[in-house]
Each structure stands twice: as structure tokens, then as C-alpha cells.
């Protein structure tokens, strides 16, 4: 009897405890239900996961935008017995104009050849170090031919100047496999807009390139290279033969290309004045070596390096 009585008491205690728990949980459950009903759809778990994915994507895009398009590390170039470049390192960002600058004979022409994968035959060339394009070794992984598809070198003069401006640009467009006349016309307009040259070249599309003034001939050469839709545009001494006004116009055209196409524009120049007005970033070469790299305004006015100061002050040419 005593055991049965004890069991009954325990059962009654358990039932009372369960009732108390249920009564205390009901308000909390009701509050959760009301909160859930009032939440907008985007606060759901799936939406939060979606926001997490978006945040990761933005972070990745930010990282990609900060990653240089071209990385040069400890690059050395020997042409036969002559060492043209030695232990060269710098970065090139997309969407900016980078000036490779220095006195004549400093190695910037050879560096532009190396970046454009247009070096002479392999028997005479000995390379060391790394040129990386889009995260891949331009010579060992991509190969020179594939790398040249991503990089456009601007060549001034030549037989193409016998063609009309329209045909010169259209030739590069057709090389990409575009043959529809309407598509070619639209692409020509895109190229001219990228250069801010709708008026300077757009009014002379049917004129021979050779018949144009010096500035317009240079712009036509750049437009022809730009029609290939390159990731990097390489230009050597674009202000040669131009007066101050035309040099400024050329600098603005190069800035426009970088800004509107996100292309990396690389300019090789021994003219400190043109480097100052055209470039966002600069790399200073002396005797085949890089002595300093960084934002052009800093190199121009706040550098502590002797050779950089001497170049921008015009003391070495």
C-alpha cells in the first residue's frame, strides 16, 4: 500500500510539472509564431544564405579587382651576350594607365616586347623569372601565341596606313571571327567611343590613315589594336612627333580607354612630361633594372630615389 501511494504521489508531481512546463512554453511559442509571421520574406534562412553567397561573391570580386592583371617577378632577359633586363619586378593593374619610363636605353622597349610576347627567336633569347598574365605564366603555361591573344601591341606606321580608317579597324574585328557588317559597324563605334575619338576619327572613316594628321594617325593605330578587345594594350612612345596640345589629347584618349574598357594600358616612354600627364602608375627603369614603382604623382614629386628624381627633373635623358 505504501509503495502504491508513493507511486501515485510521484505521478501527480510529474503531471503537475508537465502542466507548468506547457503553460510556460505556450507564450514563448506564440511569440515565436507572431514574430515569424511578421518577418518579411527576405529574413528567411534561405534568404540569409543567399545574402551570405552574395557577400562572398562581392568579396571575391573585390579580391579579383585588387589582383594585378600582370605580375613581373625577378625577370631577366638576355639577347645573345647582352643583358637587356635584370631582376625586374612590378605589377600592372587593369583599368589604369601604367608608364614604363626611364632614360633612353634603359630597357623599356625590351620590357614591352617581353610583355607582348614579341621577342625575337628563341635561339637568341635567354629568359629568367616570371611574367604572369591573369594568374598564368605567359611563356611556360599559356605560351606566347595564346598570350598574344590577350595582349595587343600598338604599331605605328606600316602598310595598314594605306587602308581607310574603317578598313584598318575592321580588319582586327574580323580576326576575332566577326563578319556581319552591322556588327562590325557597331564594334567600330564602340572602339571610337572608348578612345573619345568619335569626332576625330568618326568623320574620317573612309579616308586613308596616311592622309590624316599625326594625332589622328596615332589614334587610328591604337583603335586598330583596341578592336581586338585585349586585356592589356601596349603602346610605345605615343607622343612622339606631337605638340603639347596633341600630347595632352593623346593622354586623355589613353585614360579613356583604361576607364571605359577596364583594359590595362601600358605606355613605354622616355618623356617625363608625357608620363606625368598620362599615367596613374609608374615603373622607373635605369640600365635594365627597375629602381622604383608606384603611383605616378608620388614618383614625380615625393620620391626619395636619386634616379627617379633625376628622370622626372629631366637631369637624365
Where are the language model's segments positioned?
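The feature captures the beta-strand-to-loop junction immediately N-terminal to the Walker
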Residues: 101-103
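ABC ATPase NBD coupling module
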Residues: 126-127, 135-152, 175, 299-303
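Conserved ABC ATPase "signature" C-loop
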Residues: 288-289
